Swiss-Prot record:
Name the UniProt record assigns to this protein: Small ribosomal subunit protein uS11
A Pfam cross-reference name: Ribosomal_S11
Entry keyword Iron: no
Function text: Located on the platform of the 30S subunit, it bridges several disparate RNA helices of the 16S rRNA. Forms part of the Shine-Dalgarno cleft in the 70S ribosome.
Complex formation: Part of the 30S ribosomal subunit. Interacts with proteins S7 and S18. Binds to IF-3.
Gene this chain is encoded by: rpsK
Length: 129
């Protein structure tokens, strides 16, 4: 028999610093936006699928804008004012995600492209026609 006095644990909201980093990982299929502290520990995240888009619609600039807007609003509620933005990947949601962060009221101090570029590493896939 189950005990009646079991307590449910509620997840505590992490106290965010005034300055944080936002990582935007943009692929052709989706865009993932993550708010981290300055050491890189994640605080909040969102993606195209997380805000309600399915399938090919997750890779659109509009879904990236919605995901960024959600993260920016949560960040402002936690007290984050200044952010550094790190963008990775070739997807279509890069620019619209950055614009959404600025429009939401966050002070974007720097934007860095951290897309990994091979120095002639692995052989790429064959071309698709």
């Amino acid at each position: 028999m189950a005990k009646g006095g079991a307590k449910q644990r509620t997840k505590k909201k992490k106290a965010a610093p005034e300055k944080a980093a936002i990582h935007i990982h943009s692929t052709f299929n989706n865009t993932i936006v993550t708010l981290t502290d300055t050491e890189g520990r994640p605080i909040i995240w969102s993606s195209g699928g997380n805000v309600g888009f399915k399938g090919a619609k997750k890779g659109t600039p509009f879904s990236a804008q919605m995901a960024s807007d959600k993260v920016a609003k949560e960040a402002l509620n936690l007290g984050v004012k200044r952010v550094d933005v790190y963008v990775k990947g070739p997807g279509s949601g890069r620019e619209s995600a950055i614009r959404a962060l600025q429009a939401a009221g966050l002070n974007v101090e720097s934007i860095k492209d951290v897309t990994p570029i091979p120095h002639n590493g692995c052989r790429p896939k064959k071309k698709r026609f």
